[in-house]
Curated annotation (Swiss-Prot):
Lineage: Eukaryota, Metazoa, Chordata, Craniata, Vertebrata
Gene name as annotated: MYH1
SUPFAM superfamilies in UniProt: Myosin rod fragments, P-loop containing nucleoside triphosphate hydrolases
Function field: Required for normal hearing. It plays a role in cochlear amplification of auditory stimuli, likely through the positive regulation of prestin (SLC26A5) activity and outer hair cell (OHC) electromotility.
Organism: Canis lupus familiaris (Dog)
Places the protein is found: Cytoplasm, Myofibril
Alphabetical list of SMART domains matching this protein: IQ, MYSc
Name of the protein in question: Myosin-1
Length: 1939
């Protein structure tokens, strides 16, 4: 016991952990009468304290503490322990150990709130139902590193012991916290996790990851936070517990090599999902529902569309809605915080809450029945709308899927009607499935977060699983939970009791086996063994017409009255009906089987599951992502068949699989047990119900554990350790200087000590002590050490006293001497001579003293100086030391940094290598593109030079034309009289303008549509341009950094190679040493184990020999009598065998017919029913025959037993039999050696199989990786194809200048959209085909697993057969007869052998464990061997059946193999044809692509010409505006407007002609496109058909993959050659793909240039349209002005006539003549002004000609790609030159005419002065003639311009044609790329199929070889059996002859 000072470290928890010293002293001093103080049995309280009053006649009268007097029997009175044992911490230490002592010890400790108590090797805890301060941080610190006996009992002590064991023993640990529901298991689990998270912190923070803006917690925080989240979604209130875990969890906490936390993971078991939709009255659903509705977070209420009243929701309000001990609001905050700490994203958090809310809404969905129909229909859609909204589904689709689900019938899907109840059941199933899958997904996410990827070595597992449950209504969930607790209790018993006693047996300790009455095998076998409850349940689930009633009848038929643990319950009033009862270790439970079949199959509405998979909520879609495929394969089961092939896996099978995994994990660890106890049913703190606690103590094995500790030997020490430690007790017993064995020394030592010699035993390696004896030895050792130390101290004290005494004697003598001298001095000090001496003496020594002082001063100075120097030197050295230490630290930091930088550099080096490879590929691509661009540039340069030469010639011609035009313009003044004609023509122009206005509106609408499309494309182009610029910058940066990194990389590589070499050498040496060490350790352990086994077997067989000597003679005497009975039995057996074979044959025929007819019509189903009835009848007949044979065998066995009893004393030939037995013993030893070697062979084979399994798993992962890469490649190609198609559509839309073109291209776009949909459908089909391939691969793996399991079972069966046959001897024939008869009864089990192979493997393992535990005596050995013979005979038959099945399967494989080979050759031929066609298409694509590029250039030229035309229109508009400003020169302006109008009309006519031509061309191109498209579609369809055929072939190939065994090796060489050829083709296609990528990039650049040009063109088009509007307004204004001028002209004409008359009247008058001269002078001045204006116009026209020259230069650029038209253009140029020469001649004539006109004008002026009227009229006539000539010349010029424009249009047509050709090239290139991608994908699939077939081939051959070996061993075993029979007969005949 610790003192109060030692307990002070526990702080305020100390009073709750251990009694104080004062209480312990008071307890020891309390009066106590051991004779009268007792516990007495009492009906109400079970046991009470009392005092014995009297004892008479076996009766005891006891007075209780309450004052009552009881008279009971002696066995109902139990003595009390002394007061010092009150509240003892380890109940195994009590003097009197019985039920009342344990009960009251727990009760008294519980009353003092000490809730933890040790009970032998485990800990008992009682639920306090209140908070106690025993889990604080200071308590954790106090328990850290403490041994169990050094600290009070506590869960922290158990945890620390497990932690220390893990570190010291290097073994995984587990803590099993078990008990009934409500006992406190979950709380203790949390405390264990809290302890580990505190003591094993990593010391540094986990990397903080930012997820959705939130920072995650450390690993310790996350481990602790996992509990609140799991409790919110997995805990609920039950009748016995407010916070009951409705799921089991096994938490593994992983630790690193230093003992620090590394990671954690959680495995969950058996979530009670039925609680989501149903609760009892006193219970409630999971906490999360009520937390959300607590209104702590109103935003959740709003988001989930719910209220705060739980009664509004049917699923969560069937029981209670509040729990007093739980604050739902605070718990919601804790849950939300845990979600943050565990790193869930915001989307995941919202999804969790939304799915939870959707489950609540599901419960409120209402449905009703249609009138006059059974069909259900929704009763309102509001709730469904909310649920669908929360799950991102369509409400109408959800309701339709619920009411009208689609089910698969054969190969088709049909719509099925649902009744109202069926719909409600489906809704409930969906709600439970969503909640369960969400819970499992959360656990997976938590595990991902807790997996830190740190190195981990060992783990400590904490098991917290639902406790034993007994409710009013117990269903399948309760059976699973109780069965789990039953298995755990069995594990506890096995570990605590059986292993303990096996240890004694192994050590040779004599030990009486204790029967604890806790053998749970009967109940467990009733549930899980073949024909058990689970087996019958799964069998019923396979029959479509099975019901709960048929299930109950089968249970009754199989178990009622045959198993003591299975009973029929008694009906109870007021309770739900129960169908059967099971007697568990904790009590009898009544089970209701209602709905068990549906629960076990767990069906879901597949239509709704399909909606879930397509949900926009990613979390929901992920939860059900694999449901459809799994269910389709599983045949409607909950999970896809993992190990059962095509059969579905039920809930019970999945549960048993998980339970077996859990038990396997537990068996691989060192367990620590914690037992939780419920003190009372009312949850009252401090109260304890005696009967309840006693029941738990009995059922939990607590009392039995204490008893075995007391009766056993819990303390054990190795002999060497015992000798070393306790030699001090009697050193004389072990002689010094003489070697003596440690065991003998320990025996002598214990024999010489005064202890009870019955309290210890000597084993082979250890000495064993009963409880308490080791403590006594420790006390004796302490006493002995105290004596020795006392003696040592006495001698030391004596020695010190003698030393001190000697010193005292010496001091006394010194004092005597001093006293004598002082007395003498006192006598002589007054003498005169003495006084003189005193005066002179100092003077004599003063000189010497002065010298000495001077010397001393000098020495002092020197010493001082040296001291200063030393001090300075010391300081200097200290400074140096500090500097060196700092430098050392810096160097250490530098070394660490360099190590880190080296690691980083290595990572960067790897990344740079990858980057370098990528950049080299990019550089290579860029280099190739640059070379192509250089070639193109050189070609363009040559063309440019040639065109420049041609341009210079054209410039000369244009200069001549300019001179001619300048001269022509000078003649404009002669055209003034054409104003009238212009006025008439303007009316026609108005009509034309009106038409153009209408056309303009139509163009504006089309233009607006084009602008919208153009804007979208510009945005895309801008984005791509930015991305391109950014990528180019990145490439430049990477190229710059690459050079720097190369240098660093070279240095790092040299260092890395050196380090890698050193590391490799060190690792190899380390691995060699470790391997040698492990091998030696394993050999040593194995030898020790074999030695101990052989020793025990020798002893057993010695006893066996003695008994066999007695029994053999009895058996041999009885053999003769039994042989006669055997002959009769053989006759009956032959008859039964014949019947069995007939029935088996009929049964096989019926089974084959049933399998062939499975999925047939109703008539076939009826026939199956009849056959099943016949089968049942045959089975009953068979069972009756079996019962008869069993009765006969029982009679024989009874007779045999009687004869054995009668002949028991007839023993005479004992010695001869003994010699024979010794000989047989030696033979058995040899057989044991053979069996050991066989076991080693089996273990090696098992290891090889495990390696093979791992290799297959690696191959599967590689296949998955390849499949993902193929999928990514397909996605990239699809995206590229879609992008190119989009660009093609955009190019088409850019040419939409008219409404009609827009409609046509829209139809083209629709066609492209349909084509894209078709391609998507094709892609989906390919994906489905790949998924089918994956499923086929998975099924192949399943078949492989089944074969491997069959092989392992066969191996085990053979080994067990050999062991059994070596010991069965003469009884084999009799037992074989019995078990062959039993085999008839198990025909049905043989039919289900494939399904139950995995279960039999587990049974075999448990059987091996049972065999090892039951070798105590000969009778048990004989019984065990008989059981093994029985099982092995069944296994032999099953093995033969399996062999036959394998032979049949082999023949099928051979057939399928031949089919595959033929299909493979066909596929290869088709693949070569496809490759040839692909190459030809690629060549065509390249040609078309070149033509397409030329077309793009022509399109660019066309756009520039359009721009120039718009510029010309703009210039003309400006000229018209200038003409409007000169009203006073109306005639000249009219002439100019007429000319401009003519030009505009010509331009408009030309535009109309061009437009009509363009429309015709577009229609023609559209037709060509349609033709090309139809051709491509046809080719695509052909390729699709080929691809579909290939896919079908490949699907058949994959389905028959198991058949590609022997033929694949022969075709491997051909496949390798084909692979090389395909790789060459692949390289060619990759080159073509790179070229196509370059062409695509160039097309993208051209597209961007075209977009820029189109944008400029659009701007100019807008300006032209605005100018056209202005022109229209100006024309109207000019028309009005022309009318005014016409009126003025008429007035002038009238005035002229009047003047003429006046001139005739006053001709002689001078004044009139003078006025006339003045008028002529004015006219002359006007003509001079007109001349100047014409000169100005000529200068303007010259400027326009300069613009024309610029346009000609632009035309040079346009002619880059039109070299083919050069000849035509040259001819046209020649014609133009002729025209120009003609115009030159005309120009000269005109100049001459102008001179003549000038001369005539002068003469006219002179004549005008003279008044020559006739001359003026002649001049006017001449002017008209000249104007006519000028007009004809203008017309000729206009025709010339039209001809030139026609040629330009021809050039544009050629450009456009080239562009269209280039587009076609791109389309064909896309098609070729897609076909190449498909060819590559199928090539990879073929390679993968080949690899898989090779793997399967090797596996099959290996299995076949192993099967042959097994058959050989079986033959050997049969031969041994025959030998044994012969030997038995010989022995029998010898005995008879001797008698």
């Amino acid at each position: 016991m610790s003192s109060d000072q030692e307990m002070a470290i526990f702080g305020e928890a100390a009073p709750y952990l251990r009694k104080s010293e004062k209480e312990r002293i008071e307890a020891q001093n309390r009066p106590f009468d051991a004779k009268t103080s007792v516990f007495v049995a009492e009906p109400k309280e079970s046991f009470v304290k009392g005092t014995v009053q009297s004892r008479e006649g076996g009766k005891v009268t006891v007075k209780t503490e309450a004052g009552a007097t009881l008279t009971v029997k002696e066995d109902q009175v139990f003595p009390m322990n002394p007061p010092k044992y009150d509240k003892i911490e380890d109940m195994a230490m009590m003097t009197h150990l019985h039920e009342p002592a344990v009960l009251y010890n727990l009760k008294e400790r519980y009353a003092a709130w000490m809730i933890y108590t040790y009970s032998g090797l485990f800990c008992v805890t009682v639920n306090p139902y209140k908070w106690l301060p025993v889990y604080n941080a200071e308590v954790v610190t106090a328990y850290r590193g403490k041994k169990r006996q050094e600290a009070p009992p506590h869960i922290f002590s158990i945890s620390d012991n497990a932690y220390q064991f893990m570190l010291t023993d290097r073994e995984n640990q587990s803590i099993l916290i078990t008990g009934e529901s409500g006992a406190g298991k979950t709380v203790n689990t949390k405390r264990v996790i809290q302890y580990f998270a505190t003591i094993a912190v990593t010391g540094d923070k986990k990397k903080e990851e930012v997820t959705s803006g939130k920072i995650q917690g450390t690993l310790e925080d996350q481990i602790i936070s996992a509990n609140p989240l799991l409790e919110a979604f997995g805990n609920a209130k039950t009748v016995r517990n407010d916070n009951s875990s409705r799921f089991g969890k096994f938490i593994r906490i992983h630790f690193g090599t230093t003992g620090k936390l590394a990671s954690a993971d959680i495995e969950t078991y058996l979530l009670e999902k039925s609680r989501v939709t149903f609760q009892l009255k006193a219970e409630r659903s999971y906490h999360i529902f009520y937390q959300i509705m607590s209104n702590k977070k109103p935003d959740l209420i709003e988001m989930l569309l719910i209220t705060t009243n739980p009664y509004d929701y049917a699923f969560v309000s069937q029981g209670e809605i509040t729990v007093p001990s739980i604050d739902d609001q605070e718990e919601l905050i804790a849950t939300d915080s845990a979600i943050d700490i565990l790193g869930f994203t915001s989307d995941e958090r919202v999804s969790i809450y939304k799915l939870t809310g959707a489950v609540m809404h599901y419960g409120n969905m209402k449905f009703k029945q249609k009138q006059r129909e059974e069909q259900a229909e929704p009763d309102g859609t509001e709730v469904a709308d909310k649920a669908a909204y929360l799950q991102s589904l369509n409400s109408a689709d959800l309701l339709k899927a619920l009411c009208y689900p689609r089910v698969k019938v054969g190969n088709e899907f049909v719509t099925k009607g649902q009744t109202v109840q069926q719909v409600y059941n489906a809704v409930g199933a969906l709600a439970k499935a969503v909640y369960e899958k969400m819970f499992l997904w959360m656990v997976t996410r938590i595990n991902q977060q807790l997996d830190t990827k740190q190195p981990r070595q060992y783990f400590i597992g904490v098991l917290d699983i639902a406790g034993f449950e007994i409710f009013d209504f117990n269903s399948l969930e309760q059976l699973c939970i109780n069965f789990t607790n039953e298995k755990l209790q069995q594990f506890f018993n096995h570990h605590m009791f059986v292993l303990e006693q096996e240890e004694y047996k192994k050590e040779g300790i004599e030990w009486e086996f204790i029967d604890f009455g806790m053998d749970l095998a009967a109940c467990i076998e009733l549930i899980e063994k073949p024909m058990g409850i689970f087996s019958i349940l799964e069998e019923e689930c396979m029959f479509p017409k099975a019901t709960d009633t048929s299930f109950k009848n089968k249970l009754y038929e199989q178990h009622l009255g045959k198993s003591n643990n299975f009973q029929k319950p008694k009906p109870a009033k007021g309770k739900v009906e129960a169908h059967f009862s099971l007697i568990h270790y904790a009590g009898t439970v009544d089970y209701n089987i209602g709905g068990w079949l549906d629960k076990n199959k767990d069906p879901l509405n597949e239509t709704v599951v399909g909606l879930y998979q397509k949900s926009a909520m990613k979390t929901l879609a992920n939860l059900f992502s694999g449901a459809t495929a799994a269910e389709a394969e599983a045949g409607g089961g909950k999970k896809g068949g993992k190990k059962k092939g095509s059969s579905f896996q039920t809930v019970s099978a999945l549960f048993r699989e998980n339970l077996n995994k859990l038990m396997t994990n537990l068996r691989s660890t060192h367990p620590h047990f914690v037992r939780c106890i419920i003190p009372n049913e009312t949850k009252t703190p401090g109260a304890m119900e005696h009967e309840l606690v006693l029941h738990q103590l009995r059922c939990n094995g607590v009392l039995e554990g204490i008893r075995i500790c007391r009766k056993g030997f819990p303390s054990r020490i190795l002999y060497a350790d015992f000798k070393q430690r306790y030699k001090v007790l009697n050193a004389s017993a072990i002689p010094e200087g003489q070697f003596i064995d440690s065991k003998k020394a320990s025996e002598k030592l214990l024999g010489s000590i005064d202890v009870d010699h019955t309290q210890y035993k000597f084993g082979h390696t250890k000495v064993f002590f009963k409880a308490g004896l080791l403590g006594l030895l420790e006390e004796m050792r302490d006493d002995k050490l105290a004596q020795l130390i006392t003696r040592t101290q006495a001698r030391c004290r004596g020695f010190l006293a003698r030393v001190e005494y000697q010193k005292m004697v010496e001091r006394r003598e010194s004092i005597f001497c001093i006293q004598y001298n002082i007395r003498a001095f006192m006598n002589v000090k007054h003498w005169p001579w003495m006084k003189l001496y005193f005066k002179i003496k100092p003077l004599l020594k003063s000189a010497e003293t002065e010298k000495e002082m001077a010397n001393m001063k000098e020495e002092f100075e020197k010493t001082k100086e040296s001291l200063a120097k030393a001090e300075a030197k010391r300081k200097e050295l200290e400074e140096k030391m500090v500097a060196l230490m700092q430098e050392k630290n810096d160097l250490q930091l530098q070394v660490q940094a360099e190590a880190d930088s080296l690691a980083d550099a290595e990572e960067r080096c790897d990344q740079l290598i990858k980057t370098k490879i990528q950049l080299e590929a990019k550089i290579k691509e860029v280099t190739e593109r640059a070379e192509d661009e250089e070639e193109i540039n050189a070609e363009l340069t040559a063309k440019k030079r040639k065109l420049e030469d041609e341009c210079s010639e054209l410039k000369k011609d244009i200069d001549d034309l300019e001179l001619t035009l300048a001269k022509v313009e000078k003649e404009k003044h002669a055209t003034e009289n054409k104003v009238k004609n212009l006025t008439e023509e303007m009316a026609g122009l108005d009509e034309t303008i009106a038409k153009l206005t209408k056309e303009k509106k139509a163009l504006q609408e089309a233009h607006q549509q084009t602008l919208d499309d153009l804007q979208a494309e510009e945005d895309k182009v801008n984005t791509l341009t930015k991305a391109k610029i950014k990528l180019e910058q990145q490439v430049d940066d990477l190229e710059g950094s690459l050079e720097q990194e190369k240098k660093i990389r070279m240095d790092l590589e040299r260092a890395k190679r050196k380090l890698e070499g050193d590391l490799k050498l060190a690792q190899e040496s380390t691995m060699d040493i470790e391997n040698d060490k492990q091998q030696l350790d394993e050999k040593l352990k194995k030898k020790e184990f074999e030695m101990s086994n052989l020793q025990s077997k020798i002893e057993d067989e010695q006893a066996l020999a003695m008994q066999l000597q007695k029994k053999i003679k009895e058996l041999q005497a009885r053999i003769e009598e039994l042989e006669e009975e055997i002959e009769a039995e053989r006759a009956s057996r032959a008859k039964a065998e014949k019947q069995r074979s007939d029935l088996s044959r009929e049964l096989e025929e019926i089974s084959e017919r049933l399998e062939e007819a499975g999925g047939a019509t109703s008539a076939q189903i009826e026939m199956n029913k009849k056959r099943e009835a016949e089968f049942q009848k045959m089975r009953r007949d068979l069972e009756e025959a079996t019962l008869q044979h069993e009765a006969t065998a029982a009679t024989l066995r009874k007779k045999h037993a009687d004869s054995v009893a009668e002949l028991g004393e007839q023993i005479d030939n004992l010695q001869r039999v003994k010699q024979k037995l010794e000989k047989e013993k030696s033979e058995m030893k040899m057989e044991i050696d053979d069996l050991a070697s066989n076991m080693e062979t089996v273990s090696k084979a098992k290891g090889n199989l495990e390696k093979m399994c791992r290799t297959l798993e690696d191959q599967v992962s590689e296949l998955k990786t390849k499949e993902e890469e193929q999928q990514r490649l397909i996605n990239d190609l699809t995206a590229q194809r879609a992008r190119l198609q989009t660009e093609s559509g955009e190019y088409s839309r850019q040419l939409d200048e008219k409404d009609s073109l827009v409609s046509q291209l829209s139809r083209g776009k629709l066609a492209f959209t349909q084509q894209i949909e078709e391609l998507k459908r094709q892609l989906e089909e390919e994906i489905k085909a790949k998924s089918a391939l994956a499923h086929a691969l998975q099924s192949a793996r399943h078949d492989c697993d089944l074969l491997r399991e069959q092989y392992e079972e066969e191996q085990e069966g053979k080994a067990e057969l050999q062991r059994a046959m070596s010991k069965a001897n003469s009884e084999v024939a009799q037992w074989r007869t019995k078990y062959e008869t039993d085999a008839i009864q198990r025909t049905e089990e043989l039919e289900e052998a494939k399904k139950k192979l995995a279960q039999r493997l587990q049974d075999a393992e448990e059987h091996v464990e049972a065999v090892n535990a039951k070798c105590a005596s000969l009778e048990k050995t004989k019984q065990r061997l008989q059981n093994e013979v029985e099982d092995l005979m069944i296994d032999v038959e099953r093995t033969n059946a399996a062999c036959a099945a394998l032979d049949k399967k082999q023949r099928n494989f051979d057939k399928i193999l031949a089919e595959w080979k033929q299909k493979y050759e066909e596929t290869h031929a088709e693949l070569e044809a496809s490759q040839k066609e692909s190459r030809s298409l690629s060549t065509e694509l390249f040609k078309i692509k070149n033509a397409y590029e030329e077309s793009l250039d022509q399109l660019e030229t066309l756009k520039r010409e359009n721009k120039n035309l718009q510029q010309e229109i703009s210039d003309l508009t400006e000229q018209i505006a200038e003409g409007g400003k000169r009203i006073h020169e109306l005639e000249k302006i009219k002439k100019q407007v007429e000319q401009e109008k003519t030009e505009l009309q010509a331009a408009l006519e030309e535009a109309e002609a061009s437009l009509e031509h363009e429309e015709g061309k577009i229609l023609r191109i559209q037709l060509e496109l349609n033709q090309v498209k139809s051709e491509i579609d046809r080719k695509i369809a052909e390729k699709d058909e080929e691809i579909d055929q290939l896919k079908r072939n490949h699907i058949r190939v994959v389905e028959s993959m198991q058949s590609t065994l022997d033929a694949e090796i022969r075709s491997r060489n051909d496949a390798i050659r084909l692979k090389k050829k395909m790789e060459g083709d692949l390289n060619e296609m990759e080159i073509q793909l790179n070229h196509a990528n370059r062409m695509a990039a160039e097309a993208l650049r051209n597209y961007r240039n075209t977009q820029g040009i189109l944008k400029d063109t659009q701007i100019h088009l807008d300006d032209a349209l605005r100018g056209q509007e202005d022109l229209k307004e100006q024309l109207a204004m000019v028309e009005r002005r022309a009318n005014l001028l016409q009126a003025e002209i008429e007035e002038l004409r009238a005035t002229l006539e009047q003047t003429e008359r006046s001139r005739k009247i006053a001709e002689q008058e001078l004044l009139d003549a003078s006025e006339r001269v003045q008028l002529l002078h004015t006219q002359n001045t006007s003509l001079i002004n007109t001349k100047k204006k014409l000169e100005t116009d000529i200068s303007q026209i010259q400027g326009e000609m300069e613009d024309i020259i610029q346009e000609a230069r632009n035309a040079e650029e346009k002619a880059k790609k039109a070299i083919t038209d050069a000849a035509m253009m040259a001819e046209e140029l020649k014609k133009e030159q002729d025209t120009s020469a003609h115009l030159e001649r005309m120009k000269k004539n005109m100049e001459q005419t102008v001179k003549d006109l000038q001369h005539r004008l002068d003469e006219a002026e002179q004549l005008a002065l003279k008044g020559g009227k006739k001359q003026i009229q002649k001049l006017e006539a001449r002017v008209r003639e000249l104007e006519g000539e000028v007009e004809s010349e203008q017309k000729h010029n206009i025709e010339t311009v039209k001809s030139l424009r026609k040629h330009e249009r021809r050039v544009k047509e050629l450009t456009y044609q080239t562009e269209e050709d280039r587009k076609n090239v791109l389309r064909l290139q896309d098609l070729v790329d897609k076909l190449q991608a498909k060819v590559k994908a199928y090539k990879r699939q073929a390679e993968e199929a080949e690899e898989q077939s090779n793997v399967n081939l090797s596996k099959f051959r290996k299995l076949q070889h192993e099967l042959e070996e097994a058959e050989e061993r079986a033959d050997i075993a049969e031969s041994q059996v025959n030998k044994l029979r012969v030997k038995s007969r010989e022995v029998h005949t010898k005995i008879i002859s001797e008698e």
